[in-house]
Every structure is written in structure tokens, then in C-alpha cells.
Amino acid sequence: MRHFLNINAIELDDVVDLVHRALAIKAGRSVIQSNLTVTNLFFENSTRTHSSFQMAENRLGYQQIDIDPQQSSMSKGESLTDTLKTLKAIGVDVAVIRHTVNNWYDQVLTATGHEIPHLINAGDGSGQHPSQSLLDLVTIYEQFNHFAGLNIRIVGDLAHSRVARSNAEILHHLGANMTFSGPKDWQPNDFGKFGQFVAIDDDWENLDVVIFLRVQHERITQTENQNFSTKQYHEQFGLNRVRYERLKAAAIIMHPAPVNRDVEIADELVEAPKSRIFEQMNNGVYARMAILEYTTEATHATH
């Protein structure tokens, strides 16, 4: 049974095929209407990911069952594993899950084998965010038509960002030149496998893509939150007008959103010409349609 849990566990050729498929759907290629049933199970609040999956499911003809964990038997102590077995027993084909726990799926897969729906990871703690990573790849490829050789910098709260972790690895494997910048206390040691840590303004004029990350106040310590200065962070690691103008004409800026305006990106620049933030959201629907097709091994017209 196929699942979509970690984009870096998928063959690179399949990842590239998913990018092409998402763009083909966006261009109007036909999709097969499904008679499958999907459950969206979100243990963390979400606007973009949740609604984007719902839109993707609607466009593919899925029957939807949304479950609020707080109003389910999990609030009585039922395990996620038993909940998924229950959903499979009543006919659910796919479960889209966002969870607070890193790698929540490992225990589920060990305990259940094939007695569960197809699983799609909609974000796990500070671990992985594979569907966001795919839509970012779609957005980058749509702009440049390749990944190899692009100079890409990820800026901000690297330590607590599942987006950063997914993107750093997959973009490195696709041949991009990766650099990272952010507060020293938020620089994970293992990112050195994928690129270099640099000062934010180093070689700025040669960057093709800059991905800014949200400061994840819900994941940092109380002391860090108390000592956090919005003004200081924006000056040191934010996108201001000077940095924006120094980017080359063809460069793009991205952000997984929600954006803390005037923190990661100046308010006036969130929708500036080089910004692709809302285009990322648009591409998210097509990327998640491609993910649903891939996970259920649905057939479709060639791209």
C-alpha cells in the first residue's frame, strides 16, 4: 500500500513526475474523477493545508469525512492506530493527517500493516511537511524550469520548521546550491549535510530563490518568546526594501505562510512583483491533487 509521508523517501524521478503532473493539472489536463472516500484529521490548526487538501479532494470527486480529534473517540483515549483501523473498516480509503508528534506514522505503520487507509502526511511536528515541499518545488520549477544549479537560501527559524527540513534535503538532492541563514540558536547541526550556513547578506545578489520561514512561537521556549524582539529580528533576518532591491530581477521570494508581516517580510513586500507567496497557495491545490493521485495509484492521462 502506498503512502505519502516524507518527500525525501520517494524516488527523485517520482518527485519530478509529481511536479510535472501538478503543472499539467494546472494547465488543464484531465483528471479521473474518483469514487474514493477521504478523512482529513488535523491535530493542529491549519488554514492553507487543510483547505487546500479539501479543494484538491473536491476537484477529484472524493467523498469527504472531516473528523475533529477533540470530538472523536481519541478524546476518550483511543489510539490513532485504532482510529485508523476503524476508518478503514467503515470504508475510508485515504487519511490526510497533520499531527503534533514528529514521525507519528512510524508507530502506526509498525502496528497496523495494511489494515489502514492510504496515509498522507500533512505535517508532523517539526519533522516533515511533504505536501508543502512539493508545492514549493512546483512554484520553483514553474519559474525556472529546472532545479540543478539554482542558488536557493532558506532564512529564519530553521530549527522548528518542518518546511525547512523537507525543502533543504529535497532541493539539495535535486542539485540546487543550498545556503541557510538564521539566528545561531535556530541552526540545526544536521542541515550541514545539505548546504552551508552563511550571513544573510552574503552573495545576496546571486540568489535565485529566497524562502523565508515563519517564526514558530508555538514551538520555541517561553524564555525565547519573552526575549524575542520583532524589530530586531526583522532588521537582522527579515526582507526589507533594501534587500528586496538587491535581489536580481529574475529572483523570487517565497514563504510557507502564514506570514508575520513586518517580521519575516516587510508588509509592503508580501505581494511585491518578486513574491510568489500567493502563487504557492494556488499551486498547493494542484500539488495535492497530484499527491492524491500518486498515493492511490490512480491512472490519468499522460503529462
Curated annotation (Swiss-Prot):
Carbamoyl phosphate binds at R48, T49, R98, H129, Q132, A257, P258. Its EC number is 2.1.3.2. One of its GO terms (cellular component) is cytosol. GO terms for molecular function: amino acid binding; aspartate carbamoyltransferase activity. The keyword Acyltransferase does not apply. L-aspartate binds at K76, R162, R214. Keywords: Pyrimidine biosynthesis, Transferase. GO terms for biological process: 'de novo' pyrimidine nucleobase biosynthetic process; 'de novo' UMP biosynthetic process; amino acid metabolic process. The keyword Transferase applies. It catalyses: carbamoyl phosphate + L-aspartate = N-carbamoyl-L-aspartate + phosphate + H(+). InterPro entries: Asp/Orn_carbamoyltranf_P-bd, Asp/Orn_carbamoylTrfase, Asp/Orn_carbamoylTrfase_sf, Asp_carbamoyltransf, Asp_carbamoyltransf_Asp/Orn-bd. Catalyzes the condensation of carbamoyl phosphate and aspartate to form carbamoyl aspartate and inorganic phosphate, the committed step in the de novo pyrimidine nucleotide biosynthesis pathway. HAMAP family: Asp_carb_tr. Belongs to the aspartate/ornithine carbamoyltransferase superfamily. ATCase family. This is Aspartate carbamoyltransferase catalytic subunit. The gene is pyrB.
